[in-house]
Amino acid sequence: VSAVLPAVLHAAPRLVLDADALNVIAADATLQTALRQRAAAGQATVLTPHPLEAARLLGRTSAEVQQHRLRAAVQLADLFACTVVLKGSGTVIATPGQAPLINPTGNARLATAGTGDVLAGLIGARLAAGQNAAQAASAAVYLHGRAADCWPAASTLTAGTLARRLGAALAPAAAPIGAA
């Protein structure tokens, strides 16, 4: 990740950063500067940290992030000049210059390995479709959480099944107008 991240930060017009990318950025001041410079270049960026990743980026503890989730998300958004999705119960979406949003959907079933990757992919797809970072993040977080809220009680939520169900549910909306 650390070998390719400088080039990705410089060249990608739209970017979602999660997991290892966030940990590498947290430990590298040069990458932090490159991340900040993306906004000035008009490059859309969304960070999707969980509380521990957010803590590393802010130089705090995860307990401090959890205690002040709104503040932490806004600070990250302002620090890196991008949209931040602080995952967890009451996922927070923060964008510089905008009021932070608290997502009303989702539940503990999303605390499953790989579901954050599904969310990152959903945000990336919306960015690729032309939505701005704040719109892409808030819509994706809502849909991701709504899928978990509607999940059948007798069925296990896995990342693979979540991705397939979201894909099937969203396919009609992605079809070109007039397509059958």
Residue ranges and their predicted role:
Residues 56, 112-143:
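Short, small-residue alpha-helix embedded
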Residues 101-114:
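Short pre-catalytic strand/loop immediately N-terminal to key active-site residues, enriched for Gly-Thr
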